Amino acid sequence: MYGMKQDLHTNYWVYIRAGGNKVFEEFLIFMFKYQIITMKVLQINTRYYNGGSTGRITFDLKKVMEANGIESYVAFGFGYNPKDNEKDTVYRIESDRELFISKLWTKATGHHGFNNKCETRRLLAWIDEIKPDIIHMHNIHNHYVNVRMLLEYISTKNIPCVLTMHDCWTFTGHCAYFDYSGCEKWKTGCNHCPSLRDYPKTFAPIDPSSWNYKMKKKLFAPLNITFVSPSQWLCDLQKQSFLKDKPCVVINNGVDMSVFHPIKSNVREEYGIGNRKMILAVAGGLATRKGKDYLLKLPSLLNEDEVLVLVGLKKGQEALLPTTNKVIGIQRSKTPDELVGLYSEADVFINPTLEDNFPTTNLEALACGTPIVTFNTGGSAEVVTSETGLVVDKGDMDGLLSAIRTILNKGKEQYVDACRKKAESDYNKEIQYGKYIELYKNILSR
């Protein structure tokens, strides 16, 4: 069942987990350390490679595993077609036609993660073929896999698993976040959900949250599972949920330090920023929970020598911006270097998010030497120290403006070195993803 070099497919790890001889266990760990024995790890996520932050994390983690001698596999929902040289290790779960049907069905029923039976049967057959030692799940909600079938399979096969919580969906009856709504029903039992029209959106005529909540509680209970959170905030919430008896460890997200670093750029000239003090923000699709109201109000409060630059607008959203030269909207950066240039040239990066886990944009700004101002919400504030920025009470517009001005008046040069050092020490992608490999080793040697 387990991946061994030279086709040595012996159930050594099963022996260890069953309480095998201590000397033999130490011998096997030695064999693993020097890659005489290898492990197979399967990641499962909604997206892969270019599919948002979790798709990129899945891709990057696969590469880190391969560099460390681990046989790495990925199964993902949609949004990418594996190349010919990837097809043995990268598996797309849904076709475009199945994706269209499952999106409609999921939005109609509200049972995110409880449809897609045919697609999941094919996935389980593929898992039977590759025989992973560990299954590492990321986002399993949405409309690409039947969570009930998947988790029951993992339980029946007694496969150790990891689940990285990129949001709160794992222990709620519907929502991915509840900070904005202020709902705490997830602590005792979901019903009459106030967030059915929020992500993951549903138009179900009957509230599905109670059924979803009870089903998740039942399915996760028998698993040999370790939860991972990118933030301490989410790990603390997990300990207040029905998952509280399952282990949870914090592994922060990371970014590529060779890509995100301070550079000289011509973005100020290209976008007409000039010598004005540049306040950078990522638009987040101008979603309310991502701070839309604060981003749209801020330009009216700025001085003539200050400008807000909003990057990541969707097509047509420029029309929503205030009619003033104190805001510049950018749909997408043309190249990765341009994005790095925007981070590097900014005097301050702001993230007025109202609910979030551990925003990668904060890490990218830090790595480029730019201080951060963010609301004290979710895990967003965890990256900020007195040397790297300021944290403001959630929803405090006056406090947000005051913090921006404090940093602008102090000068970015007072923050650059501390921001970069914190990024290098705490959020280096290679170091952070290496922690997953250590976690896999610890799980298999229990």
Which residue ranges define each predicted feature?
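Acidic anion/phosphate-binding donor-loop and adjacent secondary structure
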Residues: D236-K239, V255-E270, A319-L321
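Conserved donor-binding/catalytic core segment of Leloir-type glycosyltransferases
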Residues: G272-K290, L296-P299
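Nucleotide-activated donor-binding/catalytic signature segment of Leloir-type glycosyltransferases, i.e.
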Residues: Q317-D337
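Short alpha-helical donor nucleotide-sugar binding micro-motif in glycosyltransferases
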Residues: G341-A346
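Aromatic "clamp/platform" in nucleotide-sugar-dependent glycosyltransferases that forms part
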Residues: L354
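Short hydrophobic beta-strand element within catalytic cores of glycosyltransferases
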Residues: P371-T374
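Conserved acidic donor-binding segment of nucleotide-sugar-dependent glycosyltransferases
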Residues: S386, L390-M397, T406-G411
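A short, well-ordered alpha-helix in the C-terminal region of glycosyltransferases
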Residues: E413-D426, K435-E438, N442
